[in-house]
């Protein structure tokens, strides 16, 4: 099933997302994502977004599995080269959210969690390395993860020009830090991309309200491609990939356990309308806030 919303069809900017259940089988993950990209192309999507861990998710074997399966961005015959070829062959832009990137000569053998934007010529035009790492222990919810054990945090904010508008890049746990998105908005972001692999317990409580808050606060579209379902016996993701407009209206909410795509046609003028109606960025007292 393919889901479509049309908004102000006079100026088409079509953005899509895919919701998948990745595993530690890279070839199977690539096949699923390739099929989704081809569906998106059939539906004339300009930018298609995949979730965090689209290429690989740990099989629960050991804590260094993601590191051991990481690749360099320019690795010959690597997974990113294959996605670059897909983008070029299909004349589509891709948002690849959350790729395990090897770091050349890192003394601690760390990796990055990297969000890439690939243009329709198959060229990487933007790279964002996840800034906020998921180090939490919530015994009552059965949640424990120490991402910084293998992942090195990035430091740079990234806003990327694209055919659908200015994209503000982030990954998953970044969603809990509104200062990041405020900064992206101040860098003229019009669309916030939040590829994720939220756990079920935290997703049920916080996923939707956090996404809506980021859209409303910054008066931007939010495109949140998510992992869903059981990846292995010890890890499940919440799903509910969402597309939210600058007024906070949820345009798409894909059900849990559904591997599918959704897309919307947006008009960037609607962003301007929302910002003119409630000009919060003109009213902010940034010099008064100690953040």
UniProtKB/Swiss-Prot annotation:
The active site is at residues 52, 130, 172. One of its GO terms (molecular function) is deaminated glutathione amidase activity. Keywords: Hydrolase. Residues 13-268 form the CN hydrolase domain. PROSITE patterns: CN_HYDROLASE (PS50263), UPF0012 (PS01227). It catalyses: N-(4-oxoglutaryl)-L-cysteinylglycine + H2O = L-cysteinylglycine + 2-oxoglutarate. Its EC number is 3.5.1.128. Belongs to the carbon-nitrogen hydrolase superfamily. NIT1/NIT2 family. Catalyzes the hydrolysis of the amide bond in N-(4-oxoglutarate)-L-cysteinylglycine (deaminated glutathione), a metabolite repair reaction to dispose of the harmful deaminated glutathione. This is Deaminated glutathione amidase. It comes from Dictyostelium discoideum. The lineage of its organism: Eukaryota, Amoebozoa, Evosea, Eumycetozoa, Dictyostelia.
């Amino acid at each position: 099933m393919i889901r479509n919303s049309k908004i102000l069809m006079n100026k088409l900017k079509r953005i899509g997302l895919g919701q998948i259940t990745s595993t530690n089988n890279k070839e199977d993950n690539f096949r699923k994502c390739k099929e989704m990209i081809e569906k998106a192309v059939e539906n004339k999507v300009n930018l298609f977004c995949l979730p965090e861990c689209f290429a690989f998710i740990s099989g629960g074997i050991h804590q260094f599995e993601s590191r051991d399966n990481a690749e360099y961005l320019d690795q010959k015959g690597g997974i990113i080269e294959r996605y670059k070829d897909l983008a070029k062959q299909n004349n589509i832009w891709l948002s690849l959210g959350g790729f395990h990137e090897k770091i050349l000569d890192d003394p601690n053998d760390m990796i990055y969690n990297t969000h890439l934007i690939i243009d329709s010529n198959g060229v990487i035009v933007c790279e964002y390395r996840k800034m906020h790492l998921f180090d939490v222990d919530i015994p009552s919810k059965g949640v424990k993860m120490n991402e910084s054990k293998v992942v090195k945090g990035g430091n740079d904010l990234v806003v990327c020009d694209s055919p659908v508008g200015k994209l503000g890049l982030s990954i998953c746990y970044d969603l809990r830090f509104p200062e990041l998105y405020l900064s992206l908005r101040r860098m003229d972001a019009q669309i916030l991309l939040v590829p994720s692999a939220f756990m079920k317990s935290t997703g049920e409580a916080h996923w939707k309200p956090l996404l809506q808050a980021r859209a409303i606060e910054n008066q931007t579209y939010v495109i949140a491609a998510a992992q869903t379902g059981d990846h292995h016996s010890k890890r499940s993701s919440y799903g509910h990939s969402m597309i939210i407009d600058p007024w906070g209206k949820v345009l798409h909410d894909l059900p849990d356990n559904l591997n599918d795509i959704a897309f919307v046609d947006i008009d960037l003028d609607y962003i301007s309308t929302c910002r003119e109606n409630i000009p919060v960025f003109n009213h902010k007292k940034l010099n008064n806030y100690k953040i």
